[in-house]
């Protein structure tokens, strides 16, 4: 996301100095990447299948194609998680330690949750991909005649 930032007058919260503006930009980038992860998870769920049942065998090729799409969506989330973590780290440096932008408290909370480890989309993505790979393996091991 390489777009220029608009004037601080149009920010979601009141910006009074350059230090606040710098932290705002870092938090904005972090928040944007978190939202992109959420969107990729939602998109992946459209194509995902939670479990493979024996009666899915006649349609296994279609399911496998959809599961590959879901896998691609989930894997893309790792890129955004890496970016979000980087921006959260930048917004967490010493010079911002006692600077809180109260107008965007939810972004500050996300930053703190990333810092403390309570918000970790890598774990979520790992879990979803592990489950998805199991479903793919189950479908691949099915014979079309098993139904």
What do the predicted segments below correspond to?
Residues 1-20, 66, 73-76, 81:
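Helix-turn-helix repeat elements of alpha-solenoid scaffolds
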Residues 63, 68-147:
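C-terminal amphipathic alpha-helix
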Residues 56-60:
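Charged, low-complexity interaction regions
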Residues 3, 22-55, 96-117, 123-131:
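Amphipathic alpha-helical repeat scaffolds of TPR domains
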């Amino acid at each position: 996301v390489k777009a220029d930032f608009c004037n601080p007058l149009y920010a979601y919260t009141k910006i009074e100095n350059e230090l606040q503006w710098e932290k705002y930009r870092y938090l904005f980038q972090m928040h944007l990447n978190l939202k992109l992860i959420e969107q990729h998870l939602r998109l992946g769920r459209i194509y995902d299948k939670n479990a493979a049942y024996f009666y899915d065998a006649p349609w296994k090729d279609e399911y496998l194609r959809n599961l590959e799409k879901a896998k691609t969506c989930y894997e893309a989330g790792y890129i955004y998680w890496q970016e979000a973590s980087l921006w959260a780290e930048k917004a967490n440096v010493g010079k911002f330690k006692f600077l809180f932008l109260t107008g965007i408290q939810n972004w500050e909370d996300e930053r703190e949750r990333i810092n403390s480890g309570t918000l970790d989309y890598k774990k979520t993505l790992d879990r979803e991909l592990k489950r998805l790979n199991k479903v793919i393996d189950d479908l691949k091991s099915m014979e079309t005649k098993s139904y």
